[in-house]
UniProtKB/Swiss-Prot annotation:
It comes from Helicobacter pylori (strain J99 / ATCC 700824) (Campylobacter pylori J99). This is Ribosome maturation factor RimP. The lineage of its organism: Bacteria, Pseudomonadati, Campylobacterota, Epsilonproteobacteria, Campylobacterales. It holds the Pfam family DUF150_C. Keywords: Cytoplasm, Ribosome biogenesis. It is found in: Cytoplasm. Belongs to the RimP family.
Amino acid sequence: MTKKIEEKIEGVIESLGYLLYDVSLVKENEQHVLRVSLKNPNGAVSLDICQQVSEIISPLLDVCDFIQDAYILEVSSMGLERTLKTPKHFKLSLGEKVEVKLINKESFQAVLKDANDLSADFELDNHAIKSVEYKDLKKVKTLFEW
């Protein structure tokens, strides 16, 4: 269902100058919550941007009726520290510092340098590039350094 929602709202969000990072539908305290997270290629995602996007996509979602039950729509920034789950997440996070945990228990911190549909390239502290297929990743999380 979230894939259909993503397909429906992605073009609208891009027409406003922002990028759709993720869509998730969760249940919290018996209430369905549709979370839409954004990236602003020109800077931060402000509260005004979230409100603008919410006001535009909310009626669109109501007309499409993808979610049968009542739900709360939350529009937010993708966040400074987040888990990268899809090739799209990796592509939208290029140049960021990440913590990588592999299935074989190896872990390291690096800068995400490149990503495609099968793998990601990480620049290690010694400037070497380590290429890892997504299937070998256990968890990758962006790191915010103060």
